[in-house]
A protein has these predicted regions:
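Extended, compositionally biased accessory segments flanking or bridging domains
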Residues: 307, 318-319, 326, 476, ...
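Short, charge/polar-rich alpha-helical segments
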Residues: 317-353, 381-392, 427-433
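Membrane-engaging insertion elements
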Residues: 223-314, 437-445, 461
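Membrane-penetrating hydrophobic segments
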Residues: 183-211, 215, 234, 238-254
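Long, amphipathic, heptad-repeat alpha-helical coiled-coil stalk/linker regions
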Residues: 246, 356-482
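Solvent-exposed flexible segments
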Residues: 171-175, 179-182, 199-223, 275, ...
Length: 534
Protein backbone atom coordinates (compact mmCIF):
# COMPACT_ATOMS: atom_id res chain seq x y z
CA UNK A 1 0.00 0.00 0.00
CA UNK A 2 2.72 2.49 1.00
CA UNK A 3 4.68 1.65 -2.14
CA UNK A 4 1.66 2.25 -4.34
CA UNK A 5 0.93 5.57 -2.63
CA UNK A 6 4.53 6.78 -3.00
CA UNK A 7 4.65 5.65 -6.63
CA UNK A 8 1.35 7.40 -7.37
CA UNK A 9 2.60 10.50 -5.56
CA UNK A 10 5.77 10.69 -7.64
CA UNK A 11 4.06 10.36 -11.03
CA UNK A 12 1.35 12.88 -10.08
CA UNK A 13 3.71 15.43 -8.50
CA UNK A 14 3.86 18.32 -10.95
CA UNK A 15 4.46 22.03 -11.36
CA UNK A 16 5.95 24.04 -8.51
CA UNK A 17 5.39 21.24 -5.97
CA UNK A 18 7.65 18.96 -7.98
CA UNK A 19 10.27 21.59 -8.69
CA UNK A 20 10.55 22.68 -5.07
CA UNK A 21 11.13 19.11 -3.88
CA UNK A 22 13.59 18.56 -6.74
CA UNK A 23 15.48 21.75 -5.87
CA UNK A 24 15.56 20.80 -2.21
CA UNK A 25 17.06 17.34 -2.80
CA UNK A 26 19.17 17.75 -5.93
CA UNK A 27 20.12 21.43 -5.90
CA UNK A 28 20.77 22.03 -2.21
CA UNK A 29 23.93 21.31 -0.24
CA UNK A 30 25.37 22.18 3.13
CA UNK A 31 26.98 25.29 1.63
CA UNK A 32 23.59 26.71 0.66
CA UNK A 33 22.24 26.17 4.18
CA UNK A 34 25.25 27.73 5.89
CA UNK A 35 25.38 30.65 3.47
CA UNK A 36 21.65 31.29 3.85
CA UNK A 37 21.79 31.15 7.64
CA UNK A 38 24.77 33.53 7.69
CA UNK A 39 22.99 36.03 5.44
CA UNK A 40 19.86 35.79 7.58
CA UNK A 41 21.88 36.57 10.73
CA UNK A 42 23.46 39.59 9.05
CA UNK A 43 20.02 40.76 7.91
CA UNK A 44 18.65 40.45 11.44
CA UNK A 45 21.53 42.52 12.79
CA UNK A 46 20.59 45.23 10.32
CA UNK A 47 16.91 44.73 11.24
CA UNK A 48 15.98 43.59 7.73
CA UNK A 49 13.58 40.75 7.00
CA UNK A 50 15.04 38.03 4.77
CA UNK A 51 14.86 34.32 4.04
CA UNK A 52 17.82 33.52 1.84
CA UNK A 53 17.31 29.76 1.83
CA UNK A 54 13.79 30.12 0.46
CA UNK A 55 15.16 32.59 -2.08
CA UNK A 56 17.74 29.96 -3.12
CA UNK A 57 14.98 27.38 -3.64
CA UNK A 58 12.87 29.87 -5.58
CA UNK A 59 15.79 30.63 -7.91
CA UNK A 60 16.36 26.93 -8.55
CA UNK A 61 12.66 26.44 -9.25
CA UNK A 62 12.76 29.21 -11.86
CA UNK A 63 15.63 27.43 -13.63
CA UNK A 64 13.48 24.30 -13.93
CA UNK A 65 10.41 25.97 -15.46
CA UNK A 66 11.07 24.62 -18.95
CA UNK A 67 12.05 21.10 -17.89
CA UNK A 68 9.30 18.53 -18.43
CA UNK A 69 7.66 17.08 -15.31
CA UNK A 70 8.46 13.46 -16.16
CA UNK A 71 12.18 14.28 -16.51
CA UNK A 72 12.24 15.74 -13.01
CA UNK A 73 10.13 12.89 -11.64
CA UNK A 74 12.57 10.25 -12.90
CA UNK A 75 15.58 12.27 -11.69
CA UNK A 76 14.02 12.68 -8.25
CA UNK A 77 13.10 9.00 -7.99
CA UNK A 78 16.58 7.81 -9.05
CA UNK A 79 18.30 10.22 -6.67
CA UNK A 80 16.30 8.80 -3.77
CA UNK A 81 17.30 5.24 -4.72
CA UNK A 82 20.93 6.37 -4.99
CA UNK A 83 20.95 7.96 -1.54
CA UNK A 84 19.39 4.82 -0.06
CA UNK A 85 21.82 2.61 -2.05
CA UNK A 86 18.96 0.53 -3.42
CA UNK A 87 19.81 -1.83 -6.23
CA UNK A 88 18.76 -0.45 -9.59
CA UNK A 89 16.09 -2.22 -11.59
CA UNK A 90 14.00 -1.69 -14.70
CA UNK A 91 11.04 0.67 -14.47
CA UNK A 92 9.18 -0.45 -17.58
CA UNK A 93 6.13 -1.59 -15.60
CA UNK A 94 4.07 0.17 -12.95
CA UNK A 95 4.61 -2.74 -10.53
CA UNK A 96 8.40 -2.37 -10.80
CA UNK A 97 8.09 1.28 -9.74
CA UNK A 98 5.72 0.33 -6.92
CA UNK A 99 8.06 -2.41 -5.67
CA UNK A 100 11.02 -0.02 -5.56
CA UNK A 101 8.84 2.60 -3.85
CA UNK A 102 8.02 0.02 -1.17
CA UNK A 103 11.73 -0.42 -0.47
CA UNK A 104 12.10 3.38 -0.32
CA UNK A 105 9.41 3.71 2.35
CA UNK A 106 10.92 0.89 4.42
CA UNK A 107 14.44 2.34 4.27
CA UNK A 108 13.35 5.92 4.99
CA UNK A 109 11.27 4.63 7.90
CA UNK A 110 14.41 3.02 9.36
CA UNK A 111 16.33 6.26 8.76
CA UNK A 112 13.78 8.25 10.73
CA UNK A 113 13.94 5.72 13.58
CA UNK A 114 17.71 6.28 13.76
CA UNK A 115 17.52 10.06 13.33
CA UNK A 116 14.83 10.80 15.91
CA UNK A 117 14.50 8.72 19.07
CA UNK A 118 11.00 10.13 19.70
CA UNK A 119 9.70 8.54 16.51
CA UNK A 120 9.88 5.01 17.94
CA UNK A 121 7.44 5.71 20.77
CA UNK A 122 5.25 7.77 18.41
CA UNK A 123 5.12 4.87 15.93
CA UNK A 124 4.19 2.41 18.67
CA UNK A 125 1.14 4.52 19.49
CA UNK A 126 0.25 4.72 15.78
CA UNK A 127 0.33 0.96 15.23
CA UNK A 128 -2.88 1.11 13.19
CA UNK A 129 -1.27 3.49 10.66
CA UNK A 130 1.06 2.47 7.85
CA UNK A 131 4.76 3.32 7.95
CA UNK A 132 4.22 6.14 5.47
CA UNK A 133 1.34 7.59 7.47
CA UNK A 134 3.36 7.37 10.69
CA UNK A 135 6.25 9.32 9.17
CA UNK A 136 4.01 12.10 7.87
CA UNK A 137 1.98 12.39 11.08
CA UNK A 138 5.12 12.47 13.20
CA UNK A 139 6.83 15.19 11.19
CA UNK A 140 3.74 17.36 10.99
CA UNK A 141 3.15 16.82 14.70
CA UNK A 142 6.69 17.99 15.49
CA UNK A 143 6.17 21.07 13.37
CA UNK A 144 2.91 21.93 15.10
CA UNK A 145 4.53 21.34 18.50
CA UNK A 146 7.11 23.97 17.56
CA UNK A 147 4.26 26.38 16.80
CA UNK A 148 2.35 25.89 20.05
CA UNK A 149 4.42 28.40 22.01
CA UNK A 150 4.14 30.92 19.17
CA UNK A 151 0.36 30.63 19.15
CA UNK A 152 0.21 31.64 22.81
CA UNK A 153 1.98 34.87 21.93
CA UNK A 154 -0.68 35.80 19.35
CA UNK A 155 -3.18 38.50 20.23
CA UNK A 156 -6.70 37.23 20.90
CA UNK A 157 -7.73 38.73 17.57
CA UNK A 158 -5.00 36.83 15.65
CA UNK A 159 -5.79 33.63 17.55
CA UNK A 160 -9.43 34.00 16.54
CA UNK A 161 -8.54 34.60 12.87
CA UNK A 162 -6.33 31.51 12.90
CA UNK A 163 -9.04 29.40 14.61
CA UNK A 164 -11.64 30.73 12.17
CA UNK A 165 -9.77 29.29 9.19
CA UNK A 166 -9.38 25.95 10.96
CA UNK A 167 -13.11 25.94 11.72
CA UNK A 168 -13.89 26.84 8.12
CA UNK A 169 -12.24 23.58 7.07
CA UNK A 170 -14.18 21.63 9.73
CA UNK A 171 -17.50 23.15 8.66
CA UNK A 172 -16.87 21.85 5.15
CA UNK A 173 -16.78 18.26 6.40
CA UNK A 174 -19.81 15.92 6.53
CA UNK A 175 -21.90 16.23 9.70
CA UNK A 176 -20.84 12.79 10.94
CA UNK A 177 -17.17 13.84 10.86
CA UNK A 178 -17.99 17.15 12.54
CA UNK A 179 -19.74 15.22 15.32
CA UNK A 180 -16.66 13.00 15.85
CA UNK A 181 -14.37 16.05 16.01
CA UNK A 182 -16.64 17.65 18.63
CA UNK A 183 -16.55 14.46 20.70
CA UNK A 184 -12.77 14.14 20.55
CA UNK A 185 -12.23 17.84 21.32
CA UNK A 186 -14.78 17.68 24.14
CA UNK A 187 -16.78 20.70 22.96
CA UNK A 188 -20.50 21.21 22.57
CA UNK A 189 -20.35 23.39 19.50
CA UNK A 190 -17.82 24.07 16.71
CA UNK A 191 -17.52 27.85 16.92
CA UNK A 192 -14.42 29.94 16.18
CA UNK A 193 -14.11 30.71 19.88
CA UNK A 194 -14.35 27.06 20.92
CA UNK A 195 -11.65 26.10 18.40
CA UNK A 196 -9.46 28.99 19.59
CA UNK A 197 -9.75 27.85 23.20
CA UNK A 198 -9.03 24.22 22.23
CA UNK A 199 -5.83 25.24 20.42
CA UNK A 200 -4.78 27.57 23.23
CA UNK A 201 -5.29 24.96 25.95
CA UNK A 202 -4.45 21.65 24.21
CA UNK A 203 -2.05 22.94 21.58
CA UNK A 204 -2.28 23.00 17.81
CA UNK A 205 -0.56 19.60 17.54
CA UNK A 206 -3.33 17.86 19.52
CA UNK A 207 -6.18 19.67 17.79
CA UNK A 208 -4.70 19.11 14.33
CA UNK A 209 -4.02 15.43 15.07
CA UNK A 210 -7.69 14.94 15.94
CA UNK A 211 -8.82 16.68 12.76
CA UNK A 212 -6.43 14.55 10.63
CA UNK A 213 -7.58 11.38 12.38
CA UNK A 214 -11.20 12.13 11.48
CA UNK A 215 -10.91 13.88 8.10
CA UNK A 216 -7.72 12.40 6.69
CA UNK A 217 -4.52 13.89 5.33
CA UNK A 218 -6.37 16.53 3.32
CA UNK A 219 -6.25 18.75 6.41
CA UNK A 220 -2.47 19.06 6.10
CA UNK A 221 -2.99 21.14 2.97
CA UNK A 222 -5.15 23.54 4.98
CA UNK A 223 -2.62 23.50 7.81
CA UNK A 224 0.32 24.42 5.59
CA UNK A 225 -1.77 27.15 3.96
CA UNK A 226 -2.48 28.50 7.42
CA UNK A 227 1.22 28.52 8.19
CA UNK A 228 1.84 30.52 5.04
CA UNK A 229 -0.93 32.98 5.90
CA UNK A 230 0.38 33.50 9.43
CA UNK A 231 4.05 33.07 8.48
CA UNK A 232 5.09 36.42 9.91
CA UNK A 233 3.58 35.63 13.29
CA UNK A 234 5.19 32.17 13.38
CA UNK A 235 8.58 33.57 12.39
CA UNK A 236 8.55 32.04 8.90
CA UNK A 237 9.10 34.35 5.93
CA UNK A 238 7.90 33.30 2.48
CA UNK A 239 8.69 35.71 -0.40
CA UNK A 240 6.29 33.92 -2.75
CA UNK A 241 2.69 33.61 -1.67
CA UNK A 242 1.41 31.20 -4.31
CA UNK A 243 3.38 28.17 -3.17
CA UNK A 244 2.84 26.95 0.39
CA UNK A 245 3.63 23.24 0.24
CA UNK A 246 7.18 23.52 1.57
CA UNK A 247 6.31 25.68 4.55
CA UNK A 248 6.80 22.78 6.94
CA UNK A 249 10.11 21.77 5.38
CA UNK A 250 11.51 25.29 5.53
CA UNK A 251 10.57 25.54 9.18
CA UNK A 252 12.33 22.25 9.94
CA UNK A 253 15.49 23.24 8.06
CA UNK A 254 15.61 26.56 9.87
CA UNK A 255 15.59 24.76 13.20
CA UNK A 256 19.09 24.52 14.80
CA UNK A 257 18.12 21.06 16.10
CA UNK A 258 18.14 19.92 12.47
CA UNK A 259 21.18 21.83 11.24
CA UNK A 260 23.70 21.28 14.06
CA UNK A 261 23.77 17.44 13.97
CA UNK A 262 24.31 17.58 10.22
CA UNK A 263 27.28 19.92 10.61
CA UNK A 264 28.84 17.81 13.34
CA UNK A 265 28.21 14.53 11.57
CA UNK A 266 31.38 14.37 9.50
CA UNK A 267 33.79 16.95 10.81
CA UNK A 268 34.14 20.52 9.69
CA UNK A 269 36.19 19.74 6.57
CA UNK A 270 34.36 16.68 5.29
CA UNK A 271 32.08 18.52 2.89
CA UNK A 272 31.04 15.50 0.87
CA UNK A 273 30.16 13.60 4.00
CA UNK A 274 28.19 16.60 5.24
CA UNK A 275 26.24 16.80 2.00
CA UNK A 276 25.38 13.10 2.20
CA UNK A 277 24.38 13.53 5.84
CA UNK A 278 22.20 16.49 4.87
CA UNK A 279 20.45 14.55 2.12
CA UNK A 280 19.89 11.54 4.35
CA UNK A 281 18.53 13.86 7.01
CA UNK A 282 16.21 15.27 4.37
CA UNK A 283 14.86 11.90 3.19
CA UNK A 284 11.87 11.67 5.59
CA UNK A 285 10.99 15.29 4.78
CA UNK A 286 11.33 14.64 1.04
CA UNK A 287 9.05 11.60 1.19
CA UNK A 288 6.52 13.67 3.13
CA UNK A 289 6.66 16.52 0.60
CA UNK A 290 6.23 14.08 -2.30
CA UNK A 291 3.27 12.24 -0.82
CA UNK A 292 1.34 15.03 0.93
CA UNK A 293 -0.23 16.52 -2.24
CA UNK A 294 -1.46 13.10 -3.39
CA UNK A 295 -2.56 11.91 0.07
CA UNK A 296 -4.32 15.20 0.76
CA UNK A 297 -6.07 15.71 -2.55
CA UNK A 298 -5.76 12.42 -4.42
CA UNK A 299 -5.81 12.22 -8.19
CA UNK A 300 -8.60 11.26 -10.56
CA UNK A 301 -6.31 9.73 -13.14
CA UNK A 302 -2.95 8.31 -12.09
CA UNK A 303 -0.88 7.44 -15.15
CA UNK A 304 2.63 6.03 -15.18
CA UNK A 305 2.94 6.33 -18.97
CA UNK A 306 5.06 9.50 -19.12
CA UNK A 307 7.33 8.36 -16.29
CA UNK A 308 7.88 4.96 -17.93
CA UNK A 309 8.41 6.56 -21.35
CA UNK A 310 11.08 8.86 -19.91
CA UNK A 311 12.79 5.95 -18.17
CA UNK A 312 12.64 3.86 -21.37
CA UNK A 313 14.17 6.72 -23.34
CA UNK A 314 17.16 6.76 -21.00
CA UNK A 315 17.44 2.99 -20.77
CA UNK A 316 17.22 2.62 -24.56
CA UNK A 317 20.00 5.19 -24.97
CA UNK A 318 22.05 3.27 -22.39
CA UNK A 319 21.40 -0.04 -24.18
CA UNK A 320 22.40 1.55 -27.47
CA UNK A 321 25.71 2.67 -25.96
CA UNK A 322 26.31 -0.79 -24.52
CA UNK A 323 25.61 -2.41 -27.90
CA UNK A 324 27.89 0.11 -29.62
CA UNK A 325 30.60 -0.77 -27.09
CA UNK A 326 30.10 -4.49 -27.72
CA UNK A 327 30.31 -3.93 -31.49
CA UNK A 328 33.44 -1.81 -31.15
CA UNK A 329 34.95 -4.43 -28.84
CA UNK A 330 34.19 -7.18 -31.36
CA UNK A 331 35.65 -5.04 -34.15
CA UNK A 332 38.75 -4.45 -32.02
CA UNK A 333 39.22 -8.20 -31.46
CA UNK A 334 38.79 -8.82 -35.19
CA UNK A 335 41.38 -6.16 -36.03
CA UNK A 336 43.81 -7.52 -33.42
CA UNK A 337 43.43 -11.00 -34.92
CA UNK A 338 44.04 -9.65 -38.44
CA UNK A 339 47.07 -7.67 -37.25
CA UNK A 340 48.47 -10.74 -35.53
CA UNK A 341 47.95 -12.89 -38.65
CA UNK A 342 49.45 -10.18 -40.88
CA UNK A 343 52.52 -9.91 -38.63
CA UNK A 344 52.96 -13.68 -38.85
CA UNK A 345 52.84 -13.46 -42.65
CA UNK A 346 55.36 -10.61 -42.61
CA UNK A 347 57.66 -12.65 -40.37
CA UNK A 348 57.32 -15.59 -42.77
CA UNK A 349 58.21 -13.29 -45.68
CA UNK A 350 61.22 -11.91 -43.80
CA UNK A 351 62.41 -15.48 -43.29
CA UNK A 352 61.84 -16.27 -46.99
CA UNK A 353 63.69 -13.08 -48.00
CA UNK A 354 66.59 -14.04 -45.74
CA UNK A 355 66.70 -17.52 -47.31
CA UNK A 356 66.73 -16.14 -50.87
CA UNK A 357 69.46 -13.64 -49.94
CA UNK A 358 71.46 -16.48 -48.43
CA UNK A 359 71.05 -18.51 -51.63
CA UNK A 360 72.35 -15.58 -53.69
CA UNK A 361 75.36 -15.21 -51.39
CA UNK A 362 76.11 -18.94 -51.70
CA UNK A 363 75.82 -18.89 -55.49
CA UNK A 364 78.07 -15.81 -55.70
CA UNK A 365 80.64 -17.60 -53.55
CA UNK A 366 80.59 -20.48 -56.02
CA UNK A 367 81.31 -18.05 -58.88
CA UNK A 368 83.88 -16.23 -56.72
CA UNK A 369 85.89 -19.38 -56.01
CA UNK A 370 85.53 -20.56 -59.60
CA UNK A 371 87.01 -17.27 -60.85
CA UNK A 372 89.78 -17.45 -58.30
CA UNK A 373 90.84 -20.88 -59.51
CA UNK A 374 90.31 -20.27 -63.24
CA UNK A 375 92.57 -18.89 -65.92
CA UNK A 376 90.85 -15.54 -66.29
CA UNK A 377 92.44 -14.84 -69.67
CA UNK A 378 90.53 -17.75 -71.15
CA UNK A 379 87.16 -16.30 -70.07
CA UNK A 380 85.56 -14.00 -72.61
CA UNK A 381 82.77 -12.63 -70.44
CA UNK A 382 82.27 -8.99 -71.48
CA UNK A 383 84.12 -5.68 -71.75
CA UNK A 384 83.74 -4.72 -68.08
CA UNK A 385 85.02 -8.14 -67.09
CA UNK A 386 88.16 -7.66 -69.22
CA UNK A 387 88.91 -4.27 -67.59
CA UNK A 388 88.46 -5.64 -64.09
CA UNK A 389 90.54 -8.74 -65.00
CA UNK A 390 93.45 -6.53 -66.12
CA UNK A 391 93.33 -4.57 -62.83
CA UNK A 392 93.05 -7.82 -60.91
CA UNK A 393 96.10 -9.32 -62.64
CA UNK A 394 98.09 -6.10 -62.21
CA UNK A 395 97.46 -6.15 -58.47
CA UNK A 396 98.27 -9.87 -58.37
CA UNK A 397 101.62 -9.23 -60.08
CA UNK A 398 102.38 -6.43 -57.62
CA UNK A 399 101.63 -8.74 -54.67
CA UNK A 400 104.02 -11.34 -56.07
CA UNK A 401 106.75 -8.68 -56.44
CA UNK A 402 106.26 -7.59 -52.81
CA UNK A 403 106.41 -11.19 -51.61
CA UNK A 404 109.62 -11.78 -53.61
CA UNK A 405 111.22 -8.70 -52.05
CA UNK A 406 110.46 -10.08 -48.58
CA UNK A 407 112.26 -13.32 -49.40
CA UNK A 408 115.41 -11.49 -50.62
CA UNK A 409 115.58 -9.45 -47.43
CA UNK A 410 115.14 -12.55 -45.33
CA UNK A 411 118.42 -14.22 -46.55
CA UNK A 412 120.63 -11.27 -45.58
CA UNK A 413 122.35 -12.42 -42.35
CA UNK A 414 123.96 -9.14 -41.25
CA UNK A 415 122.77 -8.35 -37.69
CA UNK A 416 121.95 -4.71 -38.27
CA UNK A 417 120.58 -5.43 -41.70
CA UNK A 418 118.30 -8.12 -40.23
CA UNK A 419 116.94 -5.57 -37.77
CA UNK A 420 116.36 -3.07 -40.59
CA UNK A 421 114.78 -5.75 -42.75
CA UNK A 422 112.30 -6.61 -40.02
CA UNK A 423 110.94 -3.08 -40.07
CA UNK A 424 111.02 -3.12 -43.88
CA UNK A 425 109.20 -6.48 -44.07
CA UNK A 426 106.56 -5.22 -41.65
CA UNK A 427 105.74 -2.40 -44.04
CA UNK A 428 105.77 -4.81 -46.97
CA UNK A 429 103.33 -7.09 -45.16
CA UNK A 430 100.89 -4.20 -44.72
CA UNK A 431 101.27 -3.34 -48.42
CA UNK A 432 100.53 -6.92 -49.42
CA UNK A 433 97.37 -7.03 -47.29
CA UNK A 434 96.21 -3.73 -48.77
CA UNK A 435 96.75 -5.05 -52.30
CA UNK A 436 94.96 -8.30 -51.46
CA UNK A 437 91.91 -6.28 -50.40
CA UNK A 438 91.99 -4.44 -53.72
CA UNK A 439 92.37 -7.69 -55.59
CA UNK A 440 89.44 -9.17 -53.69
CA UNK A 441 87.37 -6.14 -54.61
CA UNK A 442 88.04 -6.65 -58.31
CA UNK A 443 87.30 -10.32 -57.98
CA UNK A 444 83.82 -9.48 -56.63
CA UNK A 445 83.38 -6.95 -59.44
CA UNK A 446 84.11 -9.74 -61.91
CA UNK A 447 81.48 -11.89 -60.15
CA UNK A 448 78.94 -9.14 -60.88
CA UNK A 449 80.22 -8.95 -64.46
CA UNK A 450 79.59 -12.67 -64.86
CA UNK A 451 76.04 -12.23 -63.54
CA UNK A 452 75.36 -9.48 -66.09
CA UNK A 453 76.76 -11.51 -68.97
CA UNK A 454 75.25 -14.14 -71.23
CA UNK A 455 78.38 -16.28 -71.06
CA UNK A 456 78.18 -20.01 -70.55
CA UNK A 457 80.56 -19.66 -67.57
CA UNK A 458 78.69 -20.64 -64.41
CA UNK A 459 75.38 -20.34 -66.25
CA UNK A 460 73.52 -22.60 -63.80
CA UNK A 461 74.63 -20.51 -60.81
CA UNK A 462 73.75 -17.36 -62.69
CA UNK A 463 70.26 -18.65 -63.48
CA UNK A 464 69.74 -19.67 -59.86
CA UNK A 465 70.69 -16.17 -58.74
CA UNK A 466 68.31 -14.62 -61.26
CA UNK A 467 65.52 -16.85 -59.99
CA UNK A 468 66.29 -15.90 -56.39
CA UNK A 469 66.33 -12.20 -57.31
CA UNK A 470 62.94 -12.60 -59.00
CA UNK A 471 61.63 -14.30 -55.86
CA UNK A 472 63.08 -11.48 -53.75
CA UNK A 473 61.28 -8.82 -55.78
CA UNK A 474 57.98 -10.63 -55.37
CA UNK A 475 58.58 -11.24 -51.67
CA UNK A 476 59.55 -7.64 -50.98
CA UNK A 477 56.57 -6.33 -52.93
CA UNK A 478 54.25 -8.63 -50.98
CA UNK A 479 55.92 -7.62 -47.73
CA UNK A 480 55.44 -3.92 -48.53
CA UNK A 481 51.78 -4.58 -49.30
CA UNK A 482 51.39 -6.48 -46.02
CA UNK A 483 53.17 -3.70 -44.11
CA UNK A 484 50.82 -1.13 -45.64
CA UNK A 485 47.85 -3.34 -44.77
CA UNK A 486 49.15 -3.83 -41.21
CA UNK A 487 49.60 -0.08 -40.77
CA UNK A 488 46.05 0.53 -41.96
CA UNK A 489 44.75 -2.12 -39.54
CA UNK A 490 46.69 -0.55 -36.67
CA UNK A 491 45.29 2.86 -37.59
CA UNK A 492 41.76 1.41 -37.58
CA UNK A 493 42.43 -0.31 -34.24
CA UNK A 494 43.61 2.98 -32.77
CA UNK A 495 40.36 4.62 -33.90
CA UNK A 496 38.31 1.71 -32.52
CA UNK A 497 40.10 2.01 -29.16
CA UNK A 498 39.37 5.74 -29.12
CA UNK A 499 35.72 5.00 -29.94
CA UNK A 500 35.55 2.49 -27.09
CA UNK A 501 37.08 5.00 -24.68
CA UNK A 502 34.59 7.67 -25.77
CA UNK A 503 31.63 5.27 -25.45
CA UNK A 504 32.81 4.14 -21.99
CA UNK A 505 32.92 7.78 -20.91
CA UNK A 506 29.37 8.27 -22.22
CA UNK A 507 28.25 5.14 -20.37
CA UNK A 508 29.87 6.32 -17.14
CA UNK A 509 28.23 9.72 -17.55
CA UNK A 510 24.82 8.09 -18.05
CA UNK A 511 25.36 5.83 -15.04
CA UNK A 512 26.32 8.83 -12.94
CA UNK A 513 23.26 10.79 -14.06
CA UNK A 514 20.89 7.81 -13.83
CA UNK A 515 21.59 5.74 -10.75
CA UNK A 516 20.90 2.03 -11.17
CA UNK A 517 21.77 1.72 -14.86
CA UNK A 518 25.10 0.16 -13.90
CA UNK A 519 23.15 -2.70 -12.30
CA UNK A 520 21.44 -3.56 -15.59
CA UNK A 521 22.67 -5.56 -18.55
CA UNK A 522 21.91 -3.86 -21.84
CA UNK A 523 22.35 -6.99 -23.97
CA UNK A 524 20.04 -9.31 -22.04
CA UNK A 525 18.04 -6.57 -20.32
CA UNK A 526 18.37 -8.60 -17.14
CA UNK A 527 19.91 -7.72 -13.80
CA UNK A 528 23.65 -8.21 -13.64
CA UNK A 529 25.10 -10.34 -10.83
CA UNK A 530 25.62 -8.38 -7.64
CA UNK A 531 29.29 -7.52 -7.10
CA UNK A 532 30.78 -7.40 -3.65
CA UNK A 533 31.41 -3.88 -2.45
CA UNK A 534 34.69 -3.11 -0.73
Amino acid sequence: MDGQILANSIVTLKGTDLRMVYALLLKTNIGHLLSSKTKDVISKLSKEESDNFTYHLEQEVNKLRNVEDQVLQVDLFLEITRLLKLRGTKYTLEQEIVDQSTFIVKDVYQLLLKQDKQFKSFAENEWNSTKLQQMIKFQMSKLFNELDNSFKDFTIDDQTKFASQVNEYIQGLPEEKQRKIKEKLGVDDLTDEMIRKAIATSGSSIVFAIIVEVSGFAFYTTATSLLASFAGLFGITLPFGVYTGLTSTIAVLANPLFLVPVLLGGGALLVNHQNKSLKKKLMPIIVMQITLPFMSQGADDVSFDLFIAEWNRRFDAYCKLQIELENEHAEGLKLQRNIRETKEKINYMNSAIHNEEQKIREEKKQIYYALKSSNLEDLGINGDFQKNRIEYQYINDRIQSLQQAKKVDAVNDSFFRRIGNKFSNLGTTFDIKSEEKKMNKYLYLMVEDVLKSTSSFKQIERERIQASKCNLRELRQSKNEKMTYKNSLESLLKQVNQNQSSIRQDIKAMEKQNYGLEHLSASSQQLLPTSEEG
